[in-house]
């Protein structure tokens, strides 16, 4: 898992400390430097400015994205963090504490805000093009390896050109493709060109001393690169060893870097100009206040708003034209909208895989090395083979830090564990001596350093201890040391020589591969195999007392359970004291949409409630739906509906000043209609100009009348009437922007009638609540009674089990003194509630592109068919596939099936 808040804290510190910039909410009004969540939710976006105090100019103008929970957020919302910031000056009153509690309950840390919506950006997985990788090109052959050498940096055009090296295994030929896409065979006369690219990488400047080649080494450059590219790659393109995952914070930092570099260059130029004129040059021309790079800052904001941060890495993505927008494809906009309160630990752990449209099914394979790195159960969109998934709890995505890598190399040079060595010192005949030496390559590039094989254990110890983010591979006479952007690591203990334990970060290659350096030096990974190792922190949190079910109930039921977790209504705890004292505040701070409010004894977590469950039937009521609830449950359903009505003021004369006044309803003003609806009044608007309202006439009712001077608009809204419904709050608010008028209308309703609500148990048994029954006659000795009944047929057919679950024994009628009375077990099971909302209709495309679009909830596209097949396929079927041809080799179908089954924790030997 990753910590988005600490990652962004790091980015803000770099901008502040390395470039001496100060943060302001608005560089035009620096005295007003505070805001609130309520202010931001009025369709505001949460960006700030980074200002150079010495000149007063704004460098990053209204484009620094502020993430909730970071120190920068606390600086601007310090009034809301009572006692949370040194500059609070004592904080505020009760309102501040309430807001702090809302922050905690809504779990908004790690998200950002655009247009009043909470958003999060997932980590992005791509193929690793930084290191050498297998490559297939029509120009060469099927068995090639490719590597990009960066280093031809053009500061003026702000690009880092790369040369592409392609090595053909069969022919032992090295090809190169230069920046103008000319192909040529590499020979010794290209050594100097290669050296140019290697000497200054353009990516890891602090490590340039590793590539300080002398004449002898330059002459051997061609052979050294060939030697590196001969190293065998024993994993496929679909392996996690061949992937990198980009963090949100890293991509954001890359987005700001070109502007910050321009600013740094301009500072150096202006300092030089001032010194040349002996300090007499005071004004450097141009506007000395305002934004320095307005166009660049506008591009930054557009990139963030459109969810196209990945374009910072890959120019190819930004050049791709999409003719058909696919609603199931995430590559168009990667921003994920979050409705608070969010699922815990979701932000920062969600990964989306950028995939190529024409290779969709191939790219979805999960190889064996995904195990323990990617959550085997929780796939955010129920995509089993996974375009979208979660990282396991022990997985880390380390920050790129070439300075610390350079320091580590210098320490090893001081210790004489690695030395600068020229092969010609020992002549060409010292084969035995050469076997003793290992050439060191950094990120698959040859360096000027080598080490002795006998020092290997010590070098691995120095590199891997204290969770240092470095990958080490050993291939024949080359020691590969890798540290680059997007590294994926897992936190583990490694025991060296059966004596020394170190805390290490291991990559998928080091952890899973048979040729891992851990095995080659005789070390071993100290591992405790438990089902929790296959899970993300999200799943460990929500299922922490029921982890045994992941190994004991069928996979399809687990998929039902974890998918419904995502869709479940939020659960909010309350007690009678809080309800009586702070009822109004409690209602106003409810999340938008449906929520479950339950007593403290019933709340399991913010998505589940505990109910005492009896396995029984009553008059075959559970034949269709497996649940019968008690007539009274310690649960209330609340609905917080927010409508926004927009109108435009129409007036011919520009000299006329429009006047608008809004009178909202003093009390909860509503009336029942005959058609099963409720008509609620928002209020009355009086205006001296006409207002044209944008609405379809179905949700709102607007009555208009006018006299000589004014127009009067009475605004009503309709809501559906349900049984036992109570209207808790009707509130309305008016705001204006230019010629537009906005009315925000909130209605909070509650009900204790749960008939027809969908419910899902933690074991994946879902159904609609049937008509309720009095279950108080099923009484335990301590007075606890049954709260819900579960169908016995459903329990058996879903292969559920109630092991390790709290239980009590009940007697019908509650007379425990009768020794002949039958004792029935009753179980305390966590449940999720969710309702059928018509929001799914918004996701159904109006036009057909492929003919496989979702229609009325039935999923018939290739994607969903594939997922259903994968999720419900049993392992036994594999033997038929393998044995069908009576050949020892596995068939193609077998490989696809094993790949899909890795997602269901079935490892096939």
UniProtKB/Swiss-Prot annotation:
Domain of life where this protein originates: Viruses
GO cellular component: DNA-directed RNA polymerase complex
Enzyme Commission code(s) on record: 2.7.7.6
Catalytic reaction annotation: RNA(n) + a ribonucleoside 5'-triphosphate = RNA(n+1) + diphosphate
Entry's Gene Ontology BP terms: DNA-templated transcription
UniProt entry keywords in alphabetical sequence: DNA-directed RNA polymerase, Nucleotidyltransferase, Transcription, Transferase
GO molecular-function terms, A-Z: DNA binding; DNA-directed RNA polymerase activity
Biological role: Required for late and very late gene expression. May be a component of the novel RNA polymerase activity induced by baculovirus infection.
Family: Belongs to the RNA polymerase beta chain family.
Record protein name field: Probable DNA-directed RNA polymerase subunit beta
Phylogenetic lineage: Viruses, Viruses incertae sedis, Naldaviricetes, Lefavirales, Baculoviridae
Encoding gene per record: LEF-8
């Amino acid at each position: 898992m990753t910590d988005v808040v600490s990652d962004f804290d790091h980015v803000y510190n770099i901008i502040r400390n390395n470039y001496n910039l100060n943060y302001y909410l608005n560089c035009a009004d620096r005295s007003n430097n505070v805001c609130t969540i309520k202010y931001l939710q009025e369709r505001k976006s949460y960006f700030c400015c980074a200002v150079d105090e010495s000149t007063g100019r704004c460098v990053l103008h209204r484009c620094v994205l502020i993430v909730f929970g970071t120190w920068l957020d606390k600086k601007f919302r310090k009034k809301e963090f009572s006692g949370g910031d040194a500059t609070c000056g004592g904080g505020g009153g009760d309102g501040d504490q309430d807001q702090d509690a809302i922050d905690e309950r809504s779990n908004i840390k790690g998200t950002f805000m655009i247009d009043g919506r909470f958003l999060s950006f997932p980590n992005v997985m791509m193929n690793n093009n930084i290191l050498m990788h297998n490559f297939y090109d029509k120009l060469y052959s099927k068995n090639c390896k490719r590597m990009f050498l960066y280093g031809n940096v053009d500061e003026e055009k702000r690009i880092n050109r790369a040369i592409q090296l392609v090595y053909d295994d069969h022919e032992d030929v090295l090809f190169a493709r230069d920046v103008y896409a000319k192909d040529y065979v590499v020979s010794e006369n290209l050594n100097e060109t290669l050296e140019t690219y290697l000497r200054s990488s353009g990516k890891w400047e602090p490590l340039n001393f590793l590539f300080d080649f002398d004449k002898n080494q330059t002459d051997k450059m061609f052979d050294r690169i060939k030697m590196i590219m001969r190293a065998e790659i024993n994993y496929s393109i679909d392996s996690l060893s061949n992937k990198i995952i980009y963090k949100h914070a890293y991509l954001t930092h890359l987005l700001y870097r070109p502007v910050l570099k321009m600013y740094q260059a301009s500072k150096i130029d202006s300092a030089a100009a001032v010194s040349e004129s002996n300090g007499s040059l005071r004004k450097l021309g141009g506007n000395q206040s305002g934004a320095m790079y307005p166009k660049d800052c506008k591009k930054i904001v557009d990139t963030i708003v459109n969810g196209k941060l990945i374009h910072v890495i890959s120019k190819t993505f930004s050049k791709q034209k999409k003719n058909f927008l696919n609603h199931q494809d995430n590559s168009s906009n990667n921003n994920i909208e979050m409705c608070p309160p969010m699922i815990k630990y979701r932000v920062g752990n969600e990964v989306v895989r950028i995939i190529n449209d024409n290779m969709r099914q191939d790219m979805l394979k999960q190889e064996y090395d995904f195990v323990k790195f990617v959550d085997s159960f929780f796939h955010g969109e129920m995509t089993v083979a996974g375009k979208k998934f979660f990282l396991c709890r022990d997985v880390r995505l380390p920050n790129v830090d070439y300075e610390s890598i350079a320091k580590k190399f210098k320490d090893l040079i001081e210790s004489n564990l690695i030395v600068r060595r020229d092969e010609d010192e020992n002549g060409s005949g010292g084969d035995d001596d050469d076997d003793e030496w290992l050439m060191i390559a950094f990120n698959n590039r040859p360096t000027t350093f080598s080490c002795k094989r006998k020092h290997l254990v010590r070098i691995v110890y120095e590199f891997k201890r204290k969770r240092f983010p470095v990958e080490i591979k050993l291939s024949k006479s080359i020691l590969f040391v890798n540290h680059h952007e997007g590294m994926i690591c897992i936190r583990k203990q490694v025991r060296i020589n059966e004596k020394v334990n170190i805390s290490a970060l291991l990559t998928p290659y080091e952890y899973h591969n048979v040729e891992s350096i851990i095995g080659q030096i005789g070390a071993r990974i100290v591992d405790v195999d438990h089902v929790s190792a296959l899970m993300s922190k999200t799943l460990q949190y929500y299922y922490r007392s029921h982890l045994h079910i992941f190994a004991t109930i069928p996979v399809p039921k687990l998929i039902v359970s974890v998918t419904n977790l995502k869709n479940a209504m939020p659960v909010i705890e309350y007690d009678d004291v809080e309800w009586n004292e702070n009822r109004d505040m409690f209602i106003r701070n409810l999340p938008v949409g449906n929520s479950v409010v339950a007593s403290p004894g019933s709340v399991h977590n913010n998505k589940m409630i505990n109910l005492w469950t009896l396995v029984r039937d009553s008059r075959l009521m559970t034949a269709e739906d497996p649940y019968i609830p008690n007539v009274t449950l310690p649960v209330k359903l609340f609905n917080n509906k927010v409508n926004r009505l927009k109108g435009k003021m129409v007036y011919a004369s520009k000299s006329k000043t429009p006047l608008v006044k809004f009178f909202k309803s003093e009390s909860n003003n509503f009336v029942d209609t005959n058609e099963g609806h409720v008509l609620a009044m928002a209020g009355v608007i009086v205006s001296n100009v006409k207002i044209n309202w944008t609405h379809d006439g179905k949700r709102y009712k607007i009555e208009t009348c006018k006299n000589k001077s004014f127009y009067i608009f009475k605004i009503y809204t309709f809501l559906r009437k349900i049984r036992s419904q109570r209207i808790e709050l009707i509130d309305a608010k008016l705001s204006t922007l230019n010629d537009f008028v906005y009315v925000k209308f909130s209605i909070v309703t509650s009900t204790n009638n749960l008939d027809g609500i969908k419910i899902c148990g933690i074991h994946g048994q879902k159904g609609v609540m049937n008509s309720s029954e009095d279950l108080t006659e099923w009484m335990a000795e301590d007075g606890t009674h049954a709260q819900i009944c579960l169908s016995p047929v459903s329990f058996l057919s879903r292969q559920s089990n109630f092991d390790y679950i709290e239980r009590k024994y009940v007697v019908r009628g509650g007379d425990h003194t009768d020794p002949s009375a039958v004792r029935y077990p009753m179980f305390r099971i966590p449940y999720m509630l969710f309702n059928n909302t018509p929001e799914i209709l918004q996701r159904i495309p109006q036009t057909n592109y492929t003919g496989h679009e979702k229609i009325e909830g039935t999923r018939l596209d290739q994607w969903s068919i594939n997922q259903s097949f994968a999720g419900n396929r049993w392992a036994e079927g594999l033997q038929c596939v393998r044995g069908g041809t009576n050949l020892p080799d596995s068939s193609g179908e077998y490989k696809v099936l094993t790949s899909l089954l890795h997602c269901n924790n079935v490892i096939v030997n």
